[in-house]
Amino acid sequence: VFSSTALRAVETIEIIKPSIKDTEIIYEKELYTFDDQIMMDFISKITDEISSVLIVGHNPAIQETVLRLSGSDQNSNLLNRVEHKYPTAAFCSLTSTIEKWAHAGDTMFKIQEFICPKEL
């Protein structure tokens, strides 16, 4: 788990900690950004030994990063929802067949879930 160092992101991590007990949490100042290119650069530097990542960050960087990674998923109702609005505390799950995080920008991801707080 990678998280911004901002208070709201840290508070979000505290809420989900019971569900991710044995998972390392790394707080990164770099994720306190509103720029999707910085987010993409961060993702591309993740070690390839890590196969699954959760990033707690900020908009518009999160929304724009999801849109960049899932751009080929054109028929997706979930993609349309992400394009329309990515509210505070929303969760989006993406999958891909990439083997190297450095290729994340070259390979498109598929949106598996998009959950907004009002749906909970």
Label each residue range with its predicted role.
Residues 73-112:
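Domain-level recognition of soluble alpha/beta enzyme cores
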Residues 31-34, 97, 117:
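Short, solvent-exposed coil/turn elements at secondary-structure transition points
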Residues 6-10, 59-60, 88:
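Alpha-helix N-cap/helix-start capping motif
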